[in-house]
Amino acid sequence: MIDNLIKRTPEINRLLENKRVTGVVTFVNPYSYYKIKEYNKISQLDYIYIDGILLLKLFNFVNGTKIKRHSFDYSSIAKTVFNYSIQNKMKIGLIGSKDYEIEQAVKNIRKKHPGIDISYFHSGYFSSLEEKSSVIDSVIKKSDIIICGLGTPAQEELALDIKIKSNEHLIFTCGGFFTQTASRADFYYPWIKRYNLMWLQRIVLYKHVRKRFFIDYPKFIVRFISENLMKIFTRSN
């Protein structure tokens, strides 16, 4: 199911051509691909993009597709989504990261996008189910576009909880975007984006990314290739 969802997800500009588009938009990389594939609510997700050059190249090779990379950050679609919200006078709600990180991220986003209407924001931590429910009710009431950054699968779970209560919102997951944007308004250096080396900058800065890159990613490569040997063999013949 995950591969079909990826294949039928339109590029972001095409998706946003529909001013009334709603649903949950999420992203997969070598770390999260199998987490989402085995997620028991995957059928409730509406759009899945590939974030990560490694997975992108493997996926396109195995499936004979020409899918492009999409990620919710300033190397990819974040600017597009924020500008879309400004042009269409839509309110933005943000949920994720720690209190001080989301507050600083909001400041940096507002500085980078004059005119943006961030009408609600909250950390990704909830003291109780009652608080989580209250946050969901508030972000639904105050926002048109909602962006959740809690890591996989917590962010997908939150996005679907929001969707269950309201099917009138466009909901994106964004991974570590708020944490990154709290440190720099445009987290990735220009030359990093130019050469698609976002993974390298994250490896240098974050210990958990180094673990994923050197331990989890090799496991992913072996599993992905072994599970798709028949497709690879068929394509080569």
From Swiss-Prot:
Reported impact of E101A: Abolishes catalytic activity
Tell me what the record says results from K211A.
Abolishes catalytic activity
Task: Give the co-factor note.
Answer: Divalent metal cation. Mn(2+), Ni(2+), and Pb(2+) enhance the enzyme activity.
**Keyword line:** Glycosyltransferase, Lipopolysaccharide biosynthesis, Transferase
User: InterPro entries annotated for this entry?
Assistant: WecG_TagA_CpsF
The reaction(s) annotated as catalysed by this protein in its Swiss-Prot or TrEMBL entry are:
N-acetyl-alpha-D-glucosaminyl-di-trans,octa-cis-undecaprenyl diphosphate + UDP-alpha-D-galactose = beta-D-Gal-(1->4)-alpha-D-GlcNAc-di-trans,octa-cis-undecaprenyl diphosphate + UDP + H(+)
The domain of life is Bacteria
Sample GO molecular function, one term? hexosyltransferase activity
What EC numbers are recorded for this enzyme?
Answer: 2.4.1.304
The cross-references to Pfam families, in alphabetical order and at most eight, read:
Glyco_tran_WecG (PF03808)
Functional pathway: Bacterial outer membrane biogenesis; LPS O-antigen biosynthesis
Cofactors needed by this protein, per the record, are: Mn(2+); Ni(2+); Pb(2+)
User: Which enzyme class?
Assistant: transferase
State the protein's name.
Answer: UDP-Gal:alpha-D-GlcNAc-diphosphoundecaprenol beta-1,4-galactosyltransferase
Q: What species does this protein belong to?
A: Shigella boydii
